[in-house]
Amino acid sequence: VDKLDRVMIFIDGSNLYHSLKGNLHRTDIDIGCFCQKLIEKRRLIRIYYYNAIVGLKQEPERYRSQQQFFNSVQQVPYLEMRLGRLVYTNAWPGTPPYEKGIDIMLTTDLLTHSFKQNYDVAILVAGDGDYVGAIQQVKNNGQNVEVALFGRENTSKPLREVADRVLEIDGRILRGCWKQGEREPNRLFPRRRPPRTHQNEINLPPVL
């Protein structure tokens, strides 16, 4: 990792939420801390966070909760928030709403800053294979692209193949980045510590 590299982070907020919920069973992430883990000691230029606004009329409680979260996200230094909208069809609530405009906004920002040479490394927090074409274009422009992924989602396979570097995100890496603190392990089972080898002494895996 080159400390002189200029880094921009592009976060698909919905993907981050569902990845945290599905893999780590909690969503109270401190976005600023999370991004610091991703950039390591490199130079952060900008964070772009994308999400879709929940309908106030359709889901008032979820809307208020989301607005509180957005307010906290906006406090993160060097972060720009890009908001799309959720589209509710006539089949609601039997059929969940869908996002509109998020992938286009993210792709536009990713490519615009690439062509302007505003970053050396782009870090993409997303699991959608639709970003593969944009990532390849960024690479063709001479920049590197890292993709932060949770677990081994099937949808992430194309991203793994095109990315210059894959950042495997798990609970160990996110230690210290939870707003509600660390959760205690199940006390019914004793703690086990692996043998202290050189690799076990490293807090982060080689990709980070």
Regions found by a protein language model. Give the residues of each.
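Terminal and domain-boundary accessory regions
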Residues: 1-208
